[in-house]
Amino acid sequence: MDSQRNLLVIALLFVSFMIWQAWEQDKNPQPQTQQTTQTTTTAAGSAADQGVPASGQGKMITVKTDVLDLTINTRGGDVEQALLPAYPKELGSNEPFQLLETTPQFIYQAQSGLTGRDGPDNPANGPRPLYNVEKDAFVLADGQNELQVPMTYTDAAGNTFTKTFVFKRGDYAVNVNYSVQNTGEKPLEVSTFGQLKQSVNLPPHRDTGSSNFALHTFRGAAYSTPDEKYEKYKFDTIADNENLNVSSKGGWVAMLQQYFATAWIPRNDGTNNFYTANLGNGIVAIGYKAQPVLVQPGQTSAMTSTLWVGPEIQDKMAAVAPHLDLTVDYGWLWFISQPLFKLLKWIHSFVGNWGFSIIIITFIVRGIMYPLTKAQYTSMAKMRMLQPKIQAMRERLGDDKQRQSQEMMALYKAEKVNPLGGCFPLIIQMPIFLALYYMLMGSIELRHAPFALWIHDLSAQDPYYILPILMGVTMFFIQKMSPTTVTDPMQQKIMTFMPVIFTVFFLWFPSGLVLYYIVSNLVTIIQQQLIYRGLEKRGLHSREKKKS
């Protein structure tokens, strides 16, 4: 099997994978808003079962730090809007990326509070608490490392509930602390809760284009427990009322999208119930409810939880909660993508340019795989040397396919040739290629990362299609330089058009991925010449016998 035939095999595998990915995406379509018109649900694990209230109207206060710009509703203390000043909405835009939003077109909120028998957020106790706040705007001043936003509510019995948001400079993790002061004569039973709710359907202004030519990043819910480190939960599963209902000591719940995430991390010193809920009107939720805490008369009890609202920065997320960094969507090849990203990030710490880092990592990967590449070309050379014997065998045995197969395998064994030896190294490269794709599409560090000249975003396609064309040219040169024994006219035509077909495929791929493939092809050309020189000395290759 020669290199051009191997190329055809890889192309077929590649196209088959694309079709499979597209089918996976299409067979689980997102539910349409009009299909979920109910306003409540009583499914197991629903928000109603957990005693989690609906949103209400209150005064909006703003909180600004160096990395967050939040809007909090004093009715319940929910975060209804979150802007990320460090991340523009689009490349070259001065408008910050909006993660949380509350508009008629789209809802994405981070709710929290105190429910349970005596909790002010328990629907059975009336409307959600209307907190008192000292001022309408809070700003983390220059030189200030921490900002506290206290909100206080006193119920009819005189019990005081204080909810304090604690922000730190440069941090996307927000501590939400609760203080319950019991001024009555009976114990108070309260439970902290945290809930994320979001509209299933994306309006046009929220579509980030995370689906790219059949490969797409995950948008949905997720959770983590000590037993299940990371589990995705699709929005359409929640909309179908197939709800989550598990108890866990520790862990977290989250909502994910390309590059960004929100997550509630409760305290791990008690048992928490994780749930999902279909809230109706095309809105779904995931949340937690902590085990009840008894506050004795005359006593004050403190509780806390943490909200992550921001980019999926892996090292910072890992420091907030175990396995929270797994929310970075590297797909089913995460075990390859994660080491690749760590290596890429290490290289970037020296180089300072993600594009040059990709070039260097390409040389490293291809260098590591050089022994396999050499074995591949050696195997193909031996196969070419056997072609006269194989052809004579076919003529001698005629239509006896069984005898042909038996004698061919005996010939391979005698000559110590593996007929699949030329294919295996190329098949190994395909997972690396796809893992790099997921890494480019899932790592926030590569979002809007420039390279050079006209490439201003390595995670987006080349706007002028120059890189895909260069990739096609390098592929054409590899094809022309590779010996072939293909005689079938149809296969020859397919081989001729293969660079064109791949160029068309790569038009929509991230430019960082195309850059990797171009450099990989250039390395292939260099390695090819070195290997052929060695094979010539062994009598396994002749440039004169090369067919174009």
From Swiss-Prot:
Major subcellular location class: membrane
Q: How does it sit in the membrane?
A: Multi-pass membrane protein
Q: Which GO terms describe its cellular component?
A: plasma membrane
Keywords carried by this UniProt record? Cell inner membrane, Cell membrane, Chaperone, Membrane, Protein transport, Transmembrane, Transmembrane helix, Transport
Q: Where in the cell is it found?
A: Cell inner membrane
Q: Cross-referenced Gene3D superfamilies, in alphabetical order?
A: 2.70.98.90
Regions that span the bilayer: 6-26, 350-370, 424-444, 458-478, 499-519
Which residues fall in a compositionally biased region of kind Low complexity?
29-42
Query: From the UniProt record, which GO molecular function terms apply?
Result: membrane insertase activity
Q: Which InterPro entries match?
A: Membr_insert_YidC, Membr_insert_YidC_N, YidC/ALB3/OXA1/COX18, YidC/Oxa/ALB_C, YidC_ALB_C, YidC_periplasmic_sf
GO process annotations (BP): protein insertion into membrane; protein transport
Annotated region Disordered: the residues are 28-56
Q: Which family does it belong to?
A: Belongs to the OXA1/ALB3/YidC family. Type 1 subfamily.
Complexes and interactors: Interacts with the Sec translocase complex via SecD. Specifically interacts with transmembrane segments of nascent integral membrane proteins during membrane integration.
The record ties this protein, via NCBIfam families, to: PRK01318.1-1, PRK01318.1-3, PRK01318.1-4, yidC_nterm, yidC_oxa1_cterm
Q: What does this protein do?
A: Required for the insertion and/or proper folding and/or complex formation of integral membrane proteins into the membrane. Involved in integration of membrane proteins that insert both dependently and independently of the Sec translocase complex, as well as at least some lipoproteins. Aids folding of multispanning membrane proteins.
Its protein name is: Membrane protein insertase YidC
Specify the taxonomic lineage. Bacteria, Pseudomonadati, Pseudomonadota, Gammaproteobacteria, Enterobacterales
